[in-house]
């Protein structure tokens, strides 16, 4: 198995994101939805990590000395802010163009992130483990979700955390995330998502717990079109995030 291929990699999905790689940091471009979503993701990860590890989220570097890996990091729009919070961040992406964009932006910004054109399978096989493992907006793009989650969870150190964000497989998510976002509003390039690959909270929880972790939180995320902002919610019918922990022993 090469470092950029594996059972989790859908080459069509990789090619689709490579075609728009140059736009990762364009807040008005194809990734604008993720840019708007980013503050919610960062807050959720920071606050959950701080509660778990007994940190103060108000500190300038609340994630200092914690190792974190961002699977499917794309151009680094999540990796960089988490590195700015003090985490030692590794960003993985199987698309070489994405990695080049991420590396160039991090170098220009002066933010230390270890970007690699690797799969999580290669990292786990090499024996690397992390305090925090992220699979944000990734599980709906892989070939075999349970196998991918099992491998991603294997990268979590004892006492560490796993996070995932994805889309629920409901008629509402089809109407909003595909018909609305891709075809009516044009927020995302057409073909970005395949509704049949969306994952229900029960399916994701089952995969995570089969990998030996315990889900400690499930939170919905909703979009307010009037304010143009995303916010956490009890509503998991479309977008949601989970956090899970690996027992210390």
From Swiss-Prot:
Its EC number is 2.1.1.222, 2.1.1.64. Pathway: Cofactor biosynthesis; ubiquinone biosynthesis. Coiled coil: none annotated. It is an enzyme of class 2 (transferase). Pfam families: Methyltransf_23. One of its GO terms (biological process) is methylation. Keywords: Methyltransferase, S-adenosyl-L-methionine, Transferase, Ubiquinone biosynthesis. GO terms for molecular function: 2-polyprenyl-6-hydroxyphenol methylase activity; 3-demethylubiquinol 3-O-methyltransferase activity; polyprenyldihydroxybenzoate methyltransferase activity. O-methyltransferase that catalyzes the 2 O-methylation steps in the ubiquinone biosynthetic pathway. It comes from the Bacteria. It catalyses: a 3-demethylubiquinol + S-adenosyl-L-methionine = a ubiquinol + S-adenosyl-L-homocysteine + H(+); a 3-(all-trans-polyprenyl)benzene-1,2-diol + S-adenosyl-L-methionine = a 2-methoxy-6-(all-trans-polyprenyl)phenol + S-adenosyl-L-homocysteine + H(+). InterPro entries: SAM-dependent_MTases_sf, UbiG_MeTrfase. This is Ubiquinone biosynthesis O-methyltransferase. S-adenosyl-L-methionine binds at residues 41, 72, 93, 136. Gene3D superfamilies: Vaccinia Virus protein VP39. Belongs to the methyltransferase superfamily. UbiG/COQ3 family.
